[in-house]
Regions:
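Aromatic-acidic/polar surface patches that form glycan- and anion
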Residues: 53-60, 126, 130, 145
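A short C-terminal helix-loop "cap" of Rossmann-like NAD(P)-dependent dehydrogenase/epimerase domains
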Residues: 16, 29-51, 103-118
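Mid/C-terminal beta-alpha module of Rossmann-like enzyme folds, strongest
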Residues: 64-129, 134, 139-140, 163-168, ...
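Residues in well-ordered alpha-helical elements
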Residues: 61-64, 135, 146, 150
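Alpha-helical substrate-binding/gating segment
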Residues: 32, 37-48, 52-83, 87-89
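Short linear loop/turn motifs
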Residues: 121-126, 148-159
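Active-site Tyr-X1-5-Lys
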Residues: 1-21
């Protein structure tokens, strides 16, 4: 069963039986190293995670808040699918350039991050193939995420970690000795 088919079953349960179901598609929030680090052209794990706050990451605190708001709003919503991610600094007008020259768009949209990245010797991605937009979740769930790329850049400028307070408290929950941490996950064959 796929995630999409599971979501469809939730929608059927709402339609057929009136069960309130709110589906949250949660962006990356884990502190573990990326499973495909070779794709990032020598960027550090912190650089990768910080960049992702613009397009495909959410702070653990914000993910928790989204779940609490969804549980509270479910009876009024009935059914809904929502993307839970940091608020992107990009607009629809940026999408074409993000495919070919993302670094320029980052520098234009988030100048604080551009300055902090330069100080750290970090780089923005050359191109982005996706940008998660959380506007429906913010509107319908009355959700106000606190951590976006500007907030992360401000934390870094103050000498704080790219990892938010809750993610530091929770830490890594990696599976010890799994092949997942050495590349793309591939189940062992008998």
């Amino acid at each position: 069963m796929t995630k999409a088919s599971s979501e469809d079953l939730c929608q059927l349960a709402h339609r057929n039986d009136g069960l309130a179901c709110v589906v949250l598609r949660v962006a990356r929030f884990f502190v573990e190293g990326d499973d495909m680090p070779d794709l990032y052209d020598g960027r550090s794990q912190d650089n990768i995670k910080a960049n992702e706050y613009a397009c495909r990451r959410v702070a653990l605190e914000d993910a928790v808040d989204a779940h609490l708001n969804a549980a509270q709003r479910a009876p009024q919503l009935g059914f809904g699918r929502y993307l839970v991610s940091a608020t992107t600094p990009f607009t629809r007008d940026d999408l074409t350039q993000l495919r070919t020259d993302a670094a320029s768009v980052f520098a234009r949209r988030v100048p604080l991050a551009a300055a902090v990245w330069t100080q750290r010797g970090w780089r923005f991605p050359d191109r982005l193939d996706r940008v998660y937009v959380n506007s429906r979740a913010r509107r319908d769930l009355n959700w106000r995420p606190r951590f976006d790329l500007n907030a992360v850049a401000a934390r870094l400028a103050r000498g704080q970690s790219v990892h938010t307070p809750l993610s530091q408290l929770v830490g890594s929950k990696a599976y010890a000795h799994s092949s997942y941490h050495r590349g793309v996950f591939a189940p062992a064959r008998p």
